[in-house]
Amino acid sequence: MTAALQALLDPTALSLGLPTPAINKEEYLAICLAALACTRAGKALVGVGGQQQVQACNKWLCPAPAAPEELRFRCTVCGKAFASYQALGGHKSSHRKPPSPGDHYGAAAAAQQLASAGDSKEDSASSAAGSTGPHRCTICRRSFATGQALGGHKRCHYWDGTSVSVSVSASASAASSAVRNFDLNLMPLPESTAAAGIKRWAEEEEVQSPLPVKKLRMSN
């Protein structure tokens, strides 16, 4: 039975998948009893070579727990450890994954929303400053708190329904539209020629004038 049990529990035959030797009924029952004994904390079997049978049964039915793998390779990004360098490389590829187009568009939309929010805040601040700012008179440059006060003040600048600024602009336009009897593009005449021309023009005016006063001047 011992030889049959050793042949049945041979690790080389088990690893290579070799066919087990034929055993009879008594040997099979003995192997079953040995397996039951292994499950009860390795009690010794009765008979010659019982200790060897227990050790072989323990190796086959109660294998030693596998030693835990040492995690020597650690990711520098997230701190996870891996047993092999290949596993670490496969994990690091997830950190180098480029962002999807949806994420890019989402980030661009968020930036645009932030920019539009900043512009709206600036516009609201400028409009509030303009509405609460002083109202200044365009004539005397005085400032007033409200538009009604400015309108009441402007009444002092008006006489008979006309504005001082309008009258000043009208007088300036009239002065600029006055006709001058000389051309700036021509060379100036000598004083003798200019005096002779003026005297001649005066004589022609007196001759052609129908007024009696000028005729008396001609007779004199």
UniProtKB/Swiss-Prot annotation:
InterPro entries: AZF1/2/3-like, Znf_C2H2_sf, Znf_C2H2_type
Induction cue: Induced by abscisic acid (ABA) and hydrogen peroxide.
Keyword Zinc recorded: yes
A GO molecular-function annotation: DNA-binding transcription factor activity
UniProt feature, compositional bias: Low complexity: 107-117
Stretches the record annotates as Disordered: 90-134
GO-annotated biological processes: regulation of DNA-templated transcription; response to oxidative stress; response to water deprivation
A UniProt-annotated Pfam family: zf-C2H2_6
Gene Ontology CC: nucleus
Cleaved signal peptide residues: none
Keywords of the record: DNA-binding, Metal-binding, Repeat, Stress response, Transcription, Transcription regulation, Zinc, Zinc-finger
Zinc finger residue extent: C2H2-type: 73-95, 135-157
Note in the entry: Plants over-expressing ZFP36 display enhanced tolerance to drought and oxidative stresses. A natural allele in the promoter of ZFP36 in the durably resistant rice variety Digu confers broad-spectrum resistance to rice blast (Magnaporthe oryzae).
Name the UniProt record assigns to this protein: Zinc finger protein 36
Species name: Oryza sativa subsp. japonica (Rice)
